[in-house]
Amino acid sequence: VLDRTLTFLGYNKKHVMNITDIGHLSGDSDDGEDKMLKTAQERHQSVLEIADFYTKAFFNDIDRLNIIRPDVVCKATEHIDEMIELIKKIEANDHTYMAGGNLYFDVTTYPDYGKLANLNLEDLKAGARVVVDENKRNPHDFVLWFTKSKFENQALVWDSPWGKGYPGWHIECSAMSMKYLGEQFDIHTGGIDHIPVHHTNEIAQSEGATGHKWVNYWLHNEFLVVQKDKNSTSDEAGKMSKSSGNFLTLQTLIDKGYDALDYRFFLLGAHYRSQVMFSWTAMDSAKNSRKALNQRVAKILLSAKDTAIT
């Protein structure tokens, strides 16, 4: 919708999307599991095979939903050199320290840390949990480059000035966006769950490297949620996600007789900053409404054609 709107309004846009095929953890902080490595080990496949499978599945769904593909699709594993060069700039500006074999970003060196989430560093320190990584000076410091992996048999590693290892997952977004969009660009999108950690860290490292503003506008979308299970002890609806077990695939909807565009129409019924509650009743309503809209448009086009002939 954003892509089509900007194009309709006459803006010269360039849409860049990254594919995280290295170092993606199950959470935004450094203490999560490595999703790619875990899945590869479970399926007895390589990390790149797992990444390729899900990338193809993702774009297959994108096409079925009639979503315009990005102008640039870039893989993290193909931009390691750019990440290393960006980390060098951050290091040259005295924002880093080595500890336990890993290179960390020191958030105390960036005064505006937490501004996206309207949090200051002192408030963050006061509410911090027990630090899992004892090498960190501050619980909110984050890894720019790992040489001492906590994961056994880390599949992909590269040479770097800090030793053989791999990048933290925040740095890829900054490095690739700067390569294709420059040191400052207009719009960065993402889920609201990325505000307090991932996007906050992106800003710190990007502006720590360049010394100026990185992104002009942030657009954060809310979650698609599902009604709680009858056996749940929570009164709240849950985010639809694979990790929680309460998720549906686009193919599931198609198998139940819905068109992929019925699902797209369902999502368009809510503001992007509002949670969307999924239900089969809502899907039926979206299916019927889209059918009625298509019929009305067809009648208008037929009427216009007849008028032109007359």
Question: Residues of each region from the PLM?
Answer:
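Alpha-helical recognition segments enriched in aromatics with Gly/Pro capping
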Residues: V1-L6, F59-N60, D81-S303
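Short, glycine/charge-rich beta-strand/loop segments that flank catalytic centers
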Residues: V16-G23, A51-F58, I68-M83, G101-T109
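The substrate-binding groove and active-site-proximal loops of carbohydrate-active enzymes
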Residues: K38-V47, V72-T77, G163, G191-I192
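Short, intrinsically disordered, charge-balanced linker/junction segments flanking boundaries
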Residues: K305-T310
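N-terminal, positively charged nucleic-acid-binding surface of large information/translation enzymes
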Residues: V1-N66
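Residue-level recognition of the N-termini of beta-strands and the immediately preceding loop/turn
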Residues: K13, P70-V72, F185, V215-N216
